[in-house]
Amino acid sequence: MVKMRIAAVSAGALCLASCNVGPDFAPPNSGLPNVPFASAASVTSSKEASPSTETPKPVDPMWWKAFSDPKLTSLEQRVALANLDLQTATLRIAESRFQRGSAAAAELPTVQGDAKYQRELYSQNGIASLLGQLAPAGSGSSPSIGALNDYTPGFDASWELDLWGRVRRQVEAADAQIEAAEDQRRDTLVSLLAEVARDYIQLRGAQALLNNAKENLKVEQDLLDLTRTRQEKGLTTGLDVENAAAQVDGVRALIPGFEQQEAEQINALSLLLDLPPNGLRGELVRAGAVPPTPARAPIGVPSELARRRPDIRRAEAQLHAQTADIGVSVAAFYPTVQLNGTLVLDSLTFNNLWKGSSVQYQAGPSVSLPIFEGGKLKSILELSKAQQQEAAIAYHKTVLQAWHDVVNAMVAYRTEQQKRSRLADQVAHSKEALTLARARYNDGVADFTTVLDVARTVLQAQQQYVQSTVNVSIDLVQLYKALGGGWEKTYPEAPTGAALKEAAN
């Protein structure tokens, strides 16, 4: 019978120990379909073929390699090692883990040791004078107390039994906050990878525009020389010479602006890699081609966004944390059971301090139950529920925004490719028109104004084509950023454990 009672008590204790009040978290349904993204071509003319298409194949975690640019790949690898924003996000992971350790410590007993020594002398006119009343009648003397030594080392221990899961819910919320911090770092990394690619592409675009301006300057200078030669022969007037000179000056004026853009983009990349201004100039000042886009871009399916985009993952982790906080608020309505104990050695002499007769202790449980809090606990609970609902709405909005980001990026990528194709045709036609205009001018059939107008059209068409080429590559970068790729294989991976502690110190 005794064994049965012991078993029943043990089973009850285990049940209480495993009790977690409040709702258990269930991962939300993102609502994203497991089918390919709707074709962005539906918003463009069906008669035009797109130079590049998207495929439902999985997104390459190292998407920047699709541009086949070794310099870009090198920059992407280095930014995760050097960027200051990423280092800050890494330290926030460490902070979250330390906060989790602080919350988990409440599951364990606390033990405090203390030791005290006092030398005491009581006043003979104070409470010690009452001892005179204890002296035998007729003794003629009264007892007195001299100086005393008091040695009292000891230990205090307490342990709150987490019967309702309050501490376990706090630890659960802290674990979710760690996940949120890790996904915040991933989100920072995704943005950095995209920013590096965007700045690098813009740098190559500025260099391409600079080279284009220099080439057109040579063309315009040739026209000016030709016009002066014709003037010397009496075949044209000074007006044509001045118009040609003005055209040369106009093209020459474009060069400083492109040089400024080049310097700004190099400095932007230097900042991302924690380098001083012009820190990458020696490496990047030599002009290179704008990174070309691949023939086919794998983009996966919408349902993969919930697992790949860090902002969606972070929103889910924050929803998890808010759900666990409801359990913490519910547990506040239940009794708190605590085991307390005190062990002290008390002696007036050091020699007797370590004897068994010097031991004194107190031990036993204590129970506290909220009876009247003026509605405080209920308000805290309702606040936790409202915060959980807010987190659920934020999750839904994040998912919906991610879907829109991808579709909008697809549309931009497709339409810009079509624009670039048309601009390529314009460049080809305008160059041919310039050749014909110069020939007719040399033959005296066309005036010089026609040549200048066509030359100006060539320059504008070439600049627009270069800018469109830049935009196509940047739109693909934006598409991959919207897809959330790039954090799965980082340089380096987020440090954990001892590395985070060292970073925090």
What are these regions (language model features)?
Residues 167, 183-301, 412, 416, ...:
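Periplasmic alpha-helical coiled-coil/stalk elements that build and connect Gram-negative outer-membrane
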Residues 231-235, 441-445, 482-486:
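A short glycine-centered flexible hinge/capping loop motif at secondary-structure junctions
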Residues 20-195, 337-341, 371-381:
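Short flexible linkers and secondary-structure junctions
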Residues 87-88, 104-105, 161-189, 239, ...:
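Sec/SRP-type N-terminal targeting helices
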Residues 149-159, 199, 301, 361-367:
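Hydrophobic, lipid-facing positions within transmembrane beta-strands of outer-membrane proteins
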Residues 234-237, 402, 409, 444-448:
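Alpha-helical heptad-repeat coiled-coil segments that mediate oligomerization/polymerization in large
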Residues 2-9, 15-81, 128-138, 144, ...:
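Terminal intrinsically disordered/low-complexity segments used for targeting and assembly
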